[in-house]
Every structure is written in structure tokens, then in C-alpha cells.
């Protein structure tokens, strides 16, 4: 009988990763492109669904594409794509489905179960939305766990289980930021405190570079790239590349040949950004990570001397400024021994192996990130479960009526740390009716909160005298009904095989169209006048051949043409760069610097 795998999935804002435990060892499953991470991007073209790298390449040029959908999870917002409104759960489900499909192929068997990670500061609605996305993708989501907790699990896999360690996890991903403090002792991982910012991540650093590039191009090249979607797509891609380069080097060169066409011909952009400039323009983002670091220490009532390890998680922690700030605040050298892009998925896979009984003597005790309570008289919140309470947990408290002869009460559930209900998030409400008339303060209403291992909450109110009770499971206010979820599961299943069959074809065609368009722009540019007529005819012939292959959907020949095409573009870019350097040898010295 084949072993039952449980997937560990890090469903990220920017990238997603899937892994399993095989023979006691974590294994990252590569996608069809041979990459260990998959961009969390979805696009539609010609009625087909495209996921990952190919979708990312057409983000700005294709209006039917979307990224960073994780930022909308748990909200009522929708995205309009392919002539249809999609809920965030549906888009996330497409990413999960894609990952499940290639995991099935890598493992040689269908996999149904998964542990999916979420930021520690995700609220109840966001967790429900994530679980629904998994269901739509055809997965049995056996557990939702916090990303920093998963990272600590991965770190502690081969550690001495009898060794007591307090671990701080600094998790800066593409779109979210968490800090968690955990204690590891005798195989038990207990979360002591957590804090963070659901709207801070590497995307924000990229955006600052894009803004800087726009201003530089306006000033130096008399062109506004914000008016050209294709140009902005290339700027965003180059911004991310520059950020990555600046994590390793002091200077990043930005080369964007044929960025666009204006009245003077092609716009060939050459810029240079230093690490100092980059760190200066993003200092305000960096400082937003400081307070959560201090908050978790205060919440756990510990000092920095009590902390044994500081783990860096998330690709954005590769930035030197981030590492420096963490070291300065904690007075400890951060541990980056585990790949920050993969550690969360590995931890999720470990949790799956624990649930499957493959890994023994390890217990994970997670916490609820925010206080849960109910509204009492005067809009005041009565807290029942304080933030950072270990879950699963059940707590009860007795309340009473506010006026004489009251026969019904409304239970309003809140989430947050403020004293008044209006300053917190309202998760839901329900009525308990049939209370026997009595003077105010006499009836006894028992309110119970129960949070399960996935962080999902159930609230019950019971009249102690009549035994009448009402229960509500706190759902995402924008969550899908059971019927909607079932329909989406069927839709996803029905389209999965067809999408899988055509995905590769679409990816190749999209890339061919993009390259063909780039070369056509080159032929129409002023600098094309430097080419002889035979060269122009040769290039036009290649464009025509590619278009013909696209119409025929001859994928094999298209792939060969694309390879040749990319080589020609690289040669053209190098030629133009040298030509520009010869004509303007002092260009690099004229770039303004930001102090």
C-alpha cells in the first residue's frame, strides 16, 4: 500500500512552496519549470488559466492577471478577471490546485491532505478563507498553522528534544510580516507571543524602487512610464531584480532597452542604484518592523538575554538592512542557516508528518493572535480569551440581562485589544431568545468561546435556567456558503485536466507573442535605420514565421524559435549598450544620488 503523504504548503503573497516528509527527511517539490518556489500569480488567456512564472511575466500587459491575492483573503473584495468576478478564495484555490497537480506527479500518486500556513496575525476570517481555498482546490486541509510556528518546527526537527530553547522568529515575506516567540522543550513547541503587520512585505520595498525609477526616467529620458502598461511591467520586474542584487552587492545596474517608443524613437534606459540610496528610500518601511519585535518580548515578559535563537524567515530577510536591524534590536546574530523561502513549507510538512504519526514525540501548541470577547452594556468589551492564549482552548463566563424582564439578548463577538467595541473588529453576532422574564441581573447567561487547532472560533450562549442555547461558528464575513464551495470544487475539478493539458502550450505562446512584439518595436524604432535592408527583411521573416507557428500552435518549433529569438535580443541589447556608452561616456557619473 502506498504511503499517504500530507503536503506542507506555504501559500505566500509573492511565492508559494510545497513540500513533504519522505523517509523522515523534508523534500521540496519542484514545479514543472524545475523551480522550488512558484510565483503566486494567476492569469487568464484564451479561456485558459495560467499559474506561476508565465502568469507573472504578463502581469501588467494582461488585464486578466492578478498577484498578491493573499492581501485580500478574508475580505469581501473581488477581482474582475476573464469577464467574471472572483473571490480571493477562488484565486488562491487555483494556485493550490496547480501545486497539488505537480506534487501528485512528483510523488507518483494523488495526494489529498495538506497543512497550509498563514501569517500569525491572520484573523478568523482570513483563516477560514484559506481553508476554503484548500477545499476548492480538492484538498483536505487537516491543519492551518502559523508561518513562524512552522519555521520553528523546521529549525527544531533535528535538535535535542530535551534542550530548552526560546526562539524568536522574524518572518518578513512578500506581503506580510510576523514576529513570534516560541519555547521548545521536551519536544513541545509552545508559542509564547506573536505580533506583526499583515500589510508589510517585500512588495513594498519593490514599490519604492519602482517609484524611484519612474522619477529617474521622467527626468533623464523625458518619458512617463506610468502611461505604458508594458513599460510598468518591466519596471516592476526590474525593481525586484535590483532589490535582490542589492542584497549581495553595493550597486545594481538597471538596463531596460526598448522600454517604449516616444516621439524621439526608442527609450533605452540605463540607471544605477546604490544600496545606500535603496536603504534610505525604504527606511520608513524598515522601522515598521521594530515595534512588533519589542512587543513580543514585552508580551512574553522576557529579556533579550532569555532568547537563544533568532530565526530569519521569508525572502525579504535577505536584505542587509533588515538583518542589521534585527541584530541591533535583539543584540544577537540572526540565524539564517535554513533557506528563508522554504523553511515555512518544510515546517508545514513536518506538522503533516506529526499528524500522520510519522514523526513522534513532537507537540505543537499555537496561540490566538488577538483577544476575543463580547460586547456588554455601554459598548464595552468583556474579554474571554486574551491574545496569545494557547490553542485549542475553551473558556466560559456568566453574564446577565441589562434591563428588567428582558427575554432575549444579542451576543456580539469582537476581536482586538481595545476597550470599546467600536474600536475592534466585529466578527459576528446572534440572538439568544426565550429567557424567562426577571429583574435585570438575575438571569444567568453562560457564554462559551471555543477555538480549535486551526484557530477557528465557535461561540455558544446558554440560559442556565431554561437550558435554551444558541451557537455560532465565526465565519469569514465574505466566506463562501457550503453550496458555493461545493460548486467551486466541482468547477475546479472539471477544468483541472483541461487546464493542465493546455498550460504548457499557453505559456509558450504567450512568451512567443511578447518576444515578437519586442522585435516589431525594434524594427519600427529610429535605431533600426542603422540596419541594412537585408537585415530588416531577415528579422521581419522571423517575426512572420513565429506568428505562423503561433497560429498553428506548433509548440516544439516555437520553443526553438524562442531560444534563437532571445539570443538575438541579448545581442541587440549589448550592441545598443556599447553604442550608447561610446556616444555618452560620462552617463554613469550623472545619476543623481539620494542621501
UniProtKB/Swiss-Prot annotation:
Q: What induces it?
A: By stress conditions e.g. heat shock.
Q: Tell me the domain of life.
A: Bacteria
Residue stretches of biased makeup (Low complexity): 582-595
* Gene3D superfamilies for this protein: 1.20.1270.10, 3.30.420.40, Actin, Chain A, domain 4, Substrate Binding Domain Of DNAk, Chain A, domain 1
This protein's UniProt keywords: ATP-binding, Chaperone, Nucleotide-binding, Phosphoprotein, Stress response
Keyword Translocase annotated: no
List Phosphothreonine occurrences by residue: 176
What does the record give under GO molecular function? ATP binding; ATP-dependent protein folding chaperone; unfolded protein binding
Q: Name one Pfam family in it.
A: HSP70
InterPro entries noted in UniProt: ATPase_NBD, Chaperone_DnaK, Heat_shock_70_CS, HSP70_C_sf, HSP70_peptide-bd_sf, Hsp_70_fam
Role, per record:
Acts as a chaperone.
Matching entries from PANTHER family are given as: HEAT SHOCK PROTEIN 70KDA
Q: What is this protein called?
A: Chaperone protein DnaK
Name the lineage. Answer: Bacteria, Bacillati, Mycoplasmatota, Mycoplasmoidales, Metamycoplasmataceae
Gene responsible for this protein: dnaK
